């Protein structure tokens, strides 16, 4: 029987990414794990609906044996079986992030025995998670360059707190993974903005986009009034397309916060990214660790080595025979993986 990997859910930033990465890696490597103090660093520790859905999705996809899969649990033991391609559908039952559930199981399905389609219902545009737009426009184009065939479709927008959204991903098994090197982003080619409105006055989106345009020359700007009862909700997206990659920055409207304040939040993050020569933004850096580790090679530059990034690296190194280096440079950090 494979050795059980013991993980401390309180390590590093103590969030849900430790659990999600462990589930992905356990399925891929066949190594069981047990985790204590799940999400100990959060105001509400233990498994919330989104995390529980990720556990149960992973369990179904690989026929795992699992103990501790209940709301609020801070302990989990997960023993994986073989990864099975197929049609899967999961419902979070709240506005929890569909994208984080998908990002838990999709890496395993890159190694499945056949094609898969995974549909998840919940939130698609959440404050503390990658949006559906980030997955489709930023993450998946980079995965394609690594040899991964995966396409996510946004079925219906879902905002906090109502949820009610859905997204589906079709994924093919990967024959091999190529490394990816992102040292310089190159010249900025195009900057676009999009305001999404669900049961929110149209002028809110107009003001958000106008405020962004005062900061950046926009090649394209859109205000999209969503229909179908998916609100209330508001998201402002700024896409920066460079020669080597596209980055996306987002902020979400909340009651009591002006449209101008939402736009200024996005502008602040984007300006901070553009002020550094680093290729990759802080959040995208987190999303690249697992695929690069699975490829066994790759490198990128990032302005800041966050606790989230370093914690994710530590978890990956427990499961895979790879080593990451995170070297400080004059303009940030060079992150490199080798086997």
Swiss-Prot record:
**Catalytic activity of the protein:** a 3'-end 3'-phospho-ribonucleotide-RNA + ATP = a 3'-end 2',3'-cyclophospho-ribonucleotide-RNA + AMP + diphosphate
Query: Under which main EC class is this enzyme filed?
Result: ligase
Enzyme Commission (EC) number: 6.5.1.4
Which Pfam family is an annotated match for this chain, by its short name? Answer: RTC_insert
Q: Care to name a GO molecular-function term for this sequence?
A: RNA-3'-phosphate cyclase activity
List where in the cell it is found: Cytoplasm
**GO annotations under biological process?**
RNA processing
Q: Catalytic residues? A: 308
Q: Keyword set for this entry?
A: ATP-binding, Cytoplasm, Ligase, Nucleotide-binding
Q: Which residues participate in ATP binding?
A: 103, 283-287
Give Gene Ontology CC terms: cytoplasm
The job of this chain, per UniProt, is described as: Catalyzes the conversion of 3'-phosphate to a 2',3'-cyclic phosphodiester at the end of RNA. The mechanism of action of the enzyme occurs in 3 steps: (A) adenylation of the enzyme by ATP; (B) transfer of adenylate to an RNA-N3'P to produce RNA-N3'PP5'A; (C) and attack of the adjacent 2'-hydroxyl on the 3'-phosphorus in the diester linkage to produce the cyclic end product. The biological role of this enzyme is unknown but it is likely to function in some aspects of cellular RNA processing.
Can you tell me which family this protein belongs to?
Answer: Belongs to the RNA 3'-terminal cyclase family. Type 1 subfamily.
What protein is this chain from?
RNA 3'-terminal phosphate cyclase
Organism equals Salmonella enteritidis PT4 (strain P125109)
